[in-house]
C-alpha cells in the first residue's frame, strides 16, 4: 500500500507515490507529511484540480511547514543494522531482530546496559545530594581499599590495604569522612578504646579484657561462680535469736555457731575455719565441686590456703581428731540448717562436742542439751 510505505520511509521526489496528473486523495495529507506536501503541490499545479484539491493542498502545505519544528522520531537500531528503518515507539516487542546475536547487535546491547547503569547512578547521586546523605567524593585507586588506620600511623587493625604502593590514606580522610556521613567503611573499634591496653598494633587475646567479665563479687562469701553460698540463712536466723534473748548467758557469737554448715567448725586458731572431709562438704553433684579461679577471700589469712585437707593441717591434731570424730553424721549441714527446731540426737551432740574446750567458762554443752530436751 503506498501510504504505508510513505509512513515507514521518508519519501523523496523521485519516490512520489502519485503521478503529477493524478487527482489527489483527501486522506493523503493525514498519513505522510512529506508525501502530503508533494500531493498538495501537484494538485495545486494541475489544470483539472477542483476547489477540494486546492483546499487539501493548502492544508498539506501547512503540515509540511510544521514538520520542520517537530522532534525527530527515534528509529530501531537493530532494524537499522539490518537495512530497515522502523520507528522505535511500540516496536520493541515486534522487532524481528530483538534476539539477534550478531556482532553489531551485541555491541548495541552492551551500550544500552552501560547507559542504563550510568543513568541509574546519576539518579541515585542526585537523590542522595538532595537528602544530604552524601557528597561527591573522588573514587580511590583501582586496587586500594579505603580502610582507615588507627591513629593515622599504626598498623591496620583487621585488614591490610591491597594496593601495591601501600600508601596511607590522607590525614583529612578519616576525620572528614565520618562527619560528613560518606559511604565508606566505618571506623574499626580500636584496641585502645577498651581502656586497659596502650598502643597495641594488632588485636591480641588479652587476659585482662576477658577476665573483666568474670570479676569476683563484692561480697567475699560468694567468691565462686559455680559454688553454692558457703553460709546459709540459718546463721542469720540463729544469730538474731541468740542476740535477742539468750538464757544460757554465753556469747551470741558462740551460740550462733550452731547454724553453720557442718564443714565449717571453729578450730583453735580463732577466726580461721577448718573444713571437714571434702566428700561431706556439700550434698551436691560433682560438677559443682570446682575449685575457685580467684585468690582466697579476704576473711582468710594470707598464708592460709583456701581448702584444708588431711595433709594440709598437721599442726592441729586435737582439733582434727575432734572434728572428724562423729561417725554417724552423713551431712551435718542438714542438722545445722534445722537446728532452730527442738531436735536432740547424736548428730547435734557431736557438733556441740566439736566446740573448743579452751573456753569452758563462756559456753558449756550441758545447758544446750537441757534446752533441747
UniProtKB/Swiss-Prot annotation:
Keywords: Developmental protein, Differentiation, DNA-binding, Metal-binding, Nucleus, Phosphoprotein, Sexual differentiation, Transcription, Transcription regulation, Zinc. It is linked to Testicular germ cell tumor: A common malignancy in males representing 95% of all testicular neoplasms. TGCTs have various pathologic subtypes including: unclassified intratubular germ cell neoplasia, seminoma (including cases with syncytiotrophoblastic cells), spermatocytic seminoma, embryonal carcinoma, yolk sac tumor, choriocarcinoma, and teratoma. 46,XY sex reversal 4: A condition characterized by male-to-female sex reversal in the presence of a normal 46,XY karyotype. Patients display complete or partial gonadal dysgenesis and a chromosome 9p deletion. The modification Phosphoserine is found at residue 339. Signal peptide: none annotated. It comes from Homo sapiens. GO terms for biological process: cell morphogenesis; germ cell migration; intracellular signal transduction; male germ cell proliferation; male sex determination; male sex differentiation; meiosis I; negative regulation of meiotic nuclear division. This is Doublesex- and mab-3-related transcription factor 1. It comes from the Eukaryota. Its main location: nucleus. PROSITE patterns: DM_1, DM_2. GO terms for cellular component: chromatin; cytoplasm; female germ cell nucleus; nucleus. Transcription factor that plays a key role in male sex determination and differentiation by controlling testis development and male germ cell proliferation. Plays a central role in spermatogonia by inhibiting meiosis in undifferentiated spermatogonia and promoting mitosis, leading to spermatogonial development and allowing abundant and continuous production of sperm. One of its GO terms (molecular function) is chromatin binding. Gene3D superfamilies: DM DNA-binding domain. Residues 72-118 bind DNA. Residues 46-58 have a biased composition (Gly residues). Residues 34-45, 59-68, 328-347 have a biased composition (Low complexity). It is found in: Nucleus.
Amino acid at each position: 500500500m503506498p501510504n504505508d510505505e510513505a509512513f515507514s520511509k521518508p519519501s523523496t521526489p523521485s519516490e512520489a507515490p502519485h503521478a503529477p496528473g493524478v487527482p489527489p486523495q483527501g486522506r493523503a495529507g493525514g498519513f505522510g507529511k512529506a508525501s502530503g506536501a508533494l500531493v498538495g503541490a501537484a494538485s495545486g499545479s494541475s489544470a483539472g484540480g477542483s476547489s477540494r484539491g486546492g483546499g487539501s493542498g493548502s492544508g498539506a502545505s501547512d503540515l509540511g511547514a510544521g514538520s520542520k519544528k517537530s522532534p525527530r522520531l527515534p528509529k530501531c537500531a537493530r532494524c537499522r543494522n539490518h537495512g530497515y528503518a522502523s520507528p522505535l515507539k511500540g516496536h520493541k516487542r515486534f522487532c524481528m531482530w530483538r534476539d539477534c546475536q550478531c556482532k553489531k547487535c551485541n555491541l548495541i546491547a552492551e551500550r544500552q546496559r552501560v547507559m542504563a547503569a550510568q543513568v541509574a547512578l546519576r539518579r541515585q547521586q542526585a537523590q542522595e545530594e538532595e537528602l544530604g546523605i552524601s557528597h561527591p567524593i573522588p573514587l580511590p585507586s583501582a586496587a586500594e581499599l579505603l580502610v582507615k588506620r588507627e591513629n593515622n600511623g599504626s598498623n591496620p587493625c583487621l585488614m591490610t590495604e591491597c594496593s601495591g604502593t601501600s600508601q596511607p590514606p590522607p590525614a583529612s580522610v578519616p576525620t572528614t569522612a565520618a562527619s560528613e556521613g560518606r559511604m565508606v567503611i566505618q571506623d574499626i573499634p580500636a584496641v585502645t578504646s577498651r581502656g586497659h591496653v596502650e598502643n597495641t598494633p594488632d588485636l591480641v587475646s588479652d587476659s585482662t579484657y576477658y577476665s573483666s567479665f568474670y570479676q569476683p563479687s563484692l561480697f567475699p562469701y560468694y567468691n565462686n561462680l559455680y559454688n553454692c553460698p558457703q553460709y546459709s540463712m540459718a546463721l542469720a536466723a540463729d544469730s538474731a535469736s541468740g542476740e535477742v534473748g539468750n538464757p544460757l548467758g554465753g556469747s551470741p557469737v558462740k551460740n550462733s555457731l550452731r547454724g553453720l554448715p557442718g564443714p565449717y567448725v571453729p578450730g583453735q586458731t580463732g577466726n580461721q575455719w577448718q573444713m571437714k572431709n571434702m566428700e561431706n562438704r556439700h550434698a551436691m553433684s560433682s560438677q559443682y565441686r570446682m575449685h575457685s579461679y580467684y585468690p582466697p577471700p579476704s576473711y582468710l589469712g594470707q598464708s592460709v590456703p583456701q581448702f584444708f585437707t588431711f595433709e594440709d593441717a598437721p599442726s592441729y591434731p586435737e582439733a582434727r581428731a575432734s572434728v572428724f570424730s562423729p561417725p554417724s553424721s552423713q551431712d551435718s549441714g542438714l542438722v545445722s540448717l534445722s537446728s532452730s527446731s527442738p531436735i536432740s540426737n547424736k548428730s547435734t551432740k557431736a557438733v556441740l562436742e566439736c566446740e573448743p574446750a579452751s573456753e569452758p567458762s563462756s559456753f558449756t554443752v550441758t545447758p544446750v542439751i537441757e534446752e533441747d530436751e
